[in-house]
């Protein structure tokens, strides 16, 4: 298997007790992060996972039996990337050397040192993924009692460790369930697909030259620059007034805002004395968070949403194409047939039942936020949503449930469910009638929000028939716009 450039590894057991030894009331399996929500739910892709409001009932209907469940998950909370970490160190250094005084609320910056490191999963991120595994088990208990998920992960350390933590959470829930009929042992097997340049990897696709390096590669940054110019000026002026001599730019202001979520998810302390000043319930938010108002955090959230939409999602002509390979793998799993794809799939892996088995009831894959944006685009999750305004903020309720914080926060998860219903639900025919008894139905949830998939005529419960769902994936089945990647 090593000759295929892939490893099937045994997951090392990280004692769940050590992860759960501290009280963590802010972050629970069912609801995710619920402290300081007026701020913490508006950090874009740096938000810790939280259960997103759903207009449709997200529970499994009483008249339906789930027969298949797939989760595609982002890794848990991490430290900044190496490039961003270096930029934050430079920013703090410039403040220390330039500022001649520190205004009210800014005094902590006088002695602040950047100590977050780079790239690695944080303790909060580990716990998020343990909680995610617990939640997956509980939701799909009827299947999970009988079968553990088949696990794949992109090869970066934080993603692999997230997959490990997920399996530990799943396993702890299984052991606590007296009704379970399987007794697997940790570590679980998993397929680790390397993220080396040029590798076919649907969980981290970087093969599309025009998207990675060509004219499509700057669309997201350009859109963010446009929106940033509409709101950041007054904030930067206020920050500079409190840090005279620092001479910060709008980009520096955004970097200071970035440090709020990164500092918060890096902390595992519980200090009730400072809880009310930040997140409450024993998990204070970083002092960086208090430098900005709630309305400014909403603008920050939208800035990140614009970047993801135009950088990797439906707003980029090649964004959804990056998710086509995974969607074609999903279709193969749903239908129980071999993968048919001409994009980013690895034919060697997907053609081997050891590394891509069909007929399993549970699957769990682990990836990155940008790759998940491509998958959501390829699924048509936000079809019908107008192009995001680059000059005025829009709320997610106006955008079909889209915001970076609602779609791809740390530990984000997409659930794809297949179920048989007894005839009491809708039929995937645009709401025009009821399905045949025991017809197979498919539904997609993004962080607990039921997505109304327009392409397959989702019913009043968000369900489409399996046949209509597969038919509606014509974009993916036709390889998207892959031909433009190398034009």
UniProtKB/Swiss-Prot annotation:
Optimum pH is 5.5-6.0. Active from 3.5 to 8.5 with phytic acid as substrate. The optimum pH is shifted to more acidic values with 4-nitrophenyl phosphate as substrate. Keywords: Disulfide bond, Glycoprotein, Hydrolase, Secreted, Signal. Glycans are attached at residues 165, 200, 247, 346. It comes from the Eukaryota. Residues 1-19 form the signal peptide. Pfam families: His_Phos_2. GO terms for cellular component: extracellular region. Its main location: secreted. The active site is at 75 (nucleophile). Monomer. Catalyzes the phosphate monoester hydrolysis of phytic acid (myo-inositol hexakisphosphate), which results in the stepwise formation of myo-inositol pentakis-, tetrakis-, tris-, bis-, and monophosphates, as well as the liberation of inorganic phosphate. Myo-inositol 2-monophosphate is the end product. Belongs to the histidine acid phosphatase family. This is Phytase A.
